[in-house]
A protein has these predicted regions:
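Outer-membrane beta-barrel "beta-signal"
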Residues: 612-626
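Extracytoplasmic beta-strand/coil segments of soluble accessory domains associated
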Residues: 65-89, 105-146, 182
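Short loop/turn motifs that connect adjacent beta-strands in outer-membrane beta-barrel proteins
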Residues: 186-191, 215-219, 254-259, 292-298, ...
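Flexible loop and strand-edge segments within Gram-negative outer membrane beta-barrel domains
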Residues: 237, 255-328, 349-355, 373-381, ...
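Short acidic/polar hinge/loop motifs at secondary-structure boundaries
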Residues: 145-172
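Outer-membrane beta-barrel translocator/receptor signature
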Residues: 175-180, 186-246, 256-258
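Transmembrane beta-strands of outer-membrane beta-barrel pores
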Residues: 197-201, 227-231, 264-270, 303-309, ...
Length: 626
């Protein structure tokens, strides 16, 4: 049996941190004072300084300061606002660090109705679901390029890193969720660094670092590195694993209106869990150009290539790999309240071979808005399409009424990426990747009432599908699709300020009249949340939370099932109590968290794939201008 060496690198991380800090000249850092420094939350909310502000600076000072020279590739920014009413959530860099998430599954699992599908600890496959969405249940766009699945029907979230990511957006649509990610955007003309290092139970260690220089090598340069390792739940490291990623980007800018970016991201995972591939890796290389001929109009073109590789078995020397490319372009229009997004993508292979889509809408901060979407793609020359619409209206300042509707067909691939190696069935025979098409319809309508910092919302839910598809990852690879079903349900949320300033009671609840694969009848979230900024300078900030995440017993897809019917098995109810705390002093963040505080020993999303019985974790997160 091949052994995978998973090293504890607590000393390495701390040493690297010490070297980085000591290598920075003290005079090159911005000394803290009574004024909030440039990389504080206030600056991140203000966003990038626009060209007019730079021009004003040049006129007033009659000289050019290096700190005022920086450019970003133009990109559209208007869309549906993030809220429970629209079903959209967003995180900026400060939000991600405050959450303490180490991957997308951890970032999303606190949201109403969202379940993280985990195969174990770090290094094992992971995914997410909402509304019972399985195969083809979500897509990922990163800097405008699609991060398509290299194996199965959805991307393995363990292979999607957060190094260098400054913003994440989740659109929790009932037909297909959309995850969008954006890499670092410059806010200042000085070099900038982010250092994150942590350690915890089960020999868990984290290091994530990012360095960006907006004026280097005739353009701008950014690099990132991250690693997470653990010995896992098993004794003597029998379930040890790690995930390691890197990122590099070079951009050439012609002012604020045109730029070209070359981007590379590589990621690999290792695990000793015998049910999973011991080594999995993917890399994504892309070239992207963006042009803004006039204010409010953005054109972009992009090309990318992804490669994927696995060790077929722990006791085998066989290495399997494949690759796939994509080409495409997009057009975006923003005029006052109106916005439009459209794109076309051509993929190597037939699963899918191409996709064209458009989204448009109106949005007003006082009165609300409406939006619509359309998408069409080809799977083995079969055209599938879907449409969606949503509205959120504010008849009063404290009331928001909302509704959304999605209907269409959605493609899902079974097997590895097109153009790569074929899948191996249970008899060791090669099988070509195939496509499954599912018809889905979903609707949601409700109201949110907010007054004086308190909010109460609820919505009626409807969902139907002609079939339910497995993810196609190692989590349920080989499972047979389930029969369709029609369900009704409702969900609610509450935010209630209580006796202490900055302290809220927050919660969400979702109920369905019938369970389904990846959709338990009840899902609940509840927590006490504290967030407050102290001192007039704003240089002291505190977050704290104590809560619970849980759901009823759940049906999951499995390949070899002995306890359920067909390809379905039932796992016990899930309940995990947790706490988190973070204090920010100027730009240094000290973070502490505990998961599964009650030490429940049968937490699982798949039969016999037990999750860690408890973990406390401490991390230092520091961003600084160099």
């Amino acid at each position: 049996m091949r052994r995978i060496r998973v090293r504890s690198f607590r000393a390495e991380a701390l040493s690297a941190l010490a070297v980085v800090v000591s290598a920075i000249p003290l005079g090159a850092q911005e000394p803290p004072d009574t004024v909030l420094v440039g990389d504080s939350l206030a600056t991140s909310f203000l966003g990038v300084i626009d060209s007019s502000r730079v021009a004003d600076t040049l006129i007033v000072e009659d000289s050019v300061s290096a700190d005022t020279i920086f450019y970003n590739l133009p990109r559209p920014k208007n869309s549906e606002p993030a809220s429970f009413a629209t079903g959209v959530w967003e995180w900026d860099r400060a939000d991600i660090m405050a959450d303490g998430a180490n991957n997308l599954a951890e970032l999303f699992h606190a949201l109403p109705g969202v379940i993280a599908l985990l195969g174990g600890d770090y290094g094992t496959p992971s995914s997410v679901t909402a509304f019972g969405l399985g195969g083809g249940g979500y897509r990922i766009l990163r800097d405008g390029l699609e991060v398509y699945a290299t194996e199965g029907s959805v991307p393995n979230l363990q292979l999607i890193g957060l190094a260098g990511i400054s913003r994440v957006r989740l659109d929790r649509s009932m037909g297909q969720m959309m995850i969008e990610m954006w890499s670092h955007e410059y806010e200042d003309g000085r070099p900038f660094s982010i250092i994150e290092a942590g350690t915890g139970d089960l020999d868990t260690n984290l290091f994530r670092g990012t360095y960006v220089d907006p004026v280097a090598l005739g353009g701008s340069v950014a690099v990132g590195l991250e690693r997470m390792d653990t010995r896992g739940r098993g004794g003597e490291g029998t379930e040890a694993g790690n995930r390691t990623g890197s990122w590099a980007r070079y951009q050439v800018h012609v002012g604020d209106r045109f730029g070209v970016a070359l981007d590379y991201r590589g990621f690999s995972t290792q695990t000793k869990v015998p049910e999973y591939t011991p080594v999995t890796k993917r890399s994504d290389f892309s070239a992207r150009a963006a042009y803004q001929p006039v204010e409010g109009l953005t054109l972009s073109a992009f090309a990318g290539r992804s490669t994927y590789g696995i060790d077929a078995a722990a006791d085998s020397l066989l290495i399997l790999d494949g690759s796939r490319s994509q080409l495409g372009g997009s057009l975006a229009v923003e005029r006052g309240m109106f916005w439009l997004r459209s794109s076309y993508r051509s993929f190597e292979g037939l699963l899918p071979s191409g996709r064209i889509e458009a989204r448009s809408g109106f949005s007003h901060h006082r009165w609300g808005g409406l939006s619509g979407s359309w998408s069409s793609s080809k799977w083995n020359d079969i055209e599938v399409s879907s449409v969606g619409a949503r509205a959120w209206l504010k008849p009063t300042t404290f009331t928001t009424m909302f509704a959304s509707y999605e209907d269409g067909s959605y493609g899902s691939r079974v097997g590895v990426l097109s153009g790569g190696i074929p899948s191996l069935d249970q008899h060791g025979l090669a099988t070509e990747a195939t496509a499954s098409i599912a018809d889905r319809t979903g609707g949601r309508a409700g109201v949110v009432i907010g007054l004086g910092g308190a909010a109460l919302g609820g919505a009626a839910l409807y969902g139907s599908a002609d079939r339910v598809l497995p993810l196609g990852l190692e989590l349920d690879d080989g499972a047979i699709e389930g029969t369709g079903l029609e369900r009704n349900g409702y969900e609610g949320m509450v935010v209630l300020p209580i006796f202490l300033q900055g302290l809220n009671l927050e919660g969400s609840y979702q109920f369905w009249d019938e369970e389904a694969p990846y959709q338990p009848r009840q899902i609940y979230r509840g927590s006490f949340q504290f967030h407050r900024v102290f001192l007039d300078s704003g240089n002291l900030e505190l977050w704290a939370s104590l809560g619970v995440r849980g759901h009823d017993p759940m049906l999951t897809f499995v390949k070899d099932n002995e306890i359920g019917e067909g390809s379905l098995a039932r796992v016990p109810f899930y309940q995990s109590w947790y706490m988190q705390a973070q204090v920010r002093i100027v730009t240094v963040r000290l973070w502490f968290g505990m998961d599964n505080m009650t030490l429940r020993r049968n937490l699982q999303m798949y039969p016999d794939r037990l999750l860690p019985y408890g973990r406390s974790f401490f991390a230092l997160r520091w961003d600084l201008w160099n």
